[in-house]
C-alpha cells in the first residue's frame, strides 16, 4: 500500500490504524499469533488511555493516527514492543509509518510552548506545524540532518566502535550550522579517526526516528593519515575486508547496514 502524508483529519471515519507509543515502545495487537498495528475506532474503546492524538495520513484506504499512551495498565490482547524490535514483525511500509508517527508524537510533546514568548502553541489544521497565537512563531517537526559514510581503502572498509559499545559501524555525525554535507563528512572523519577522505559520493538517505535524524549516506575513499580514535566518541577503529567483518555490526533496518552490504557486494 502507498502512504499519503496529510495533517488534515477526516470529518468522519469508521476504523483507523493507530500508532500509539509509550516512550520508545509501540502498541501492537496480538491476533492469533500475529503482531499487528491496532486497527480500531479509537484506543479508549479498548481501555487504552492516550493523549496528543495526531492524524498523519492514509495507508492505502486506511486512515492513520498517532498518539501517546498515558496509562500504565496492560490491556488484554495488546502489548508494548520496542520500535527497534518490531521491524521483523510488521511490514517495512508499516515500520516506516511507525517511525514517522513516533517523531510526530514526540514533536507534539516537546513543542507545546513558544520558544520565543512562552505562550501555549496551537496546532495548525492544514499542515504539521505549531503556531504561537501571541507572536505568530511557526514551528515544524524537528529533523536533525546527519551524515553517515562508508570509507574504503584498498578493498577494506573503515569500521569504528564507539565508547561503551560493542558494535562496529561506519562513521557518522550531525551536520553543523553552515556546513555542506561534504564538509560534514570530511570533518567528522577527521575528528573521530584522524584521516582525510576524497571522492565523496551520495549513496542514499533514511529517516531515523530514534534520534529524530535524517541520515544522509555517502561513500568515500581514503586519502591520507593514520587511524587515531578520538577517545571521546570512538574507542577503536580499523580497516576490514569483506570476509573479516566484526560480528557486531548494525542491524538490517539501518542505512549503516546498507552501506556495509554495499561494500561486501562491491569488493567481494
Describe each model-derived feature in a short phrase.
Residues 99-150:
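Cys/His-rich short segments
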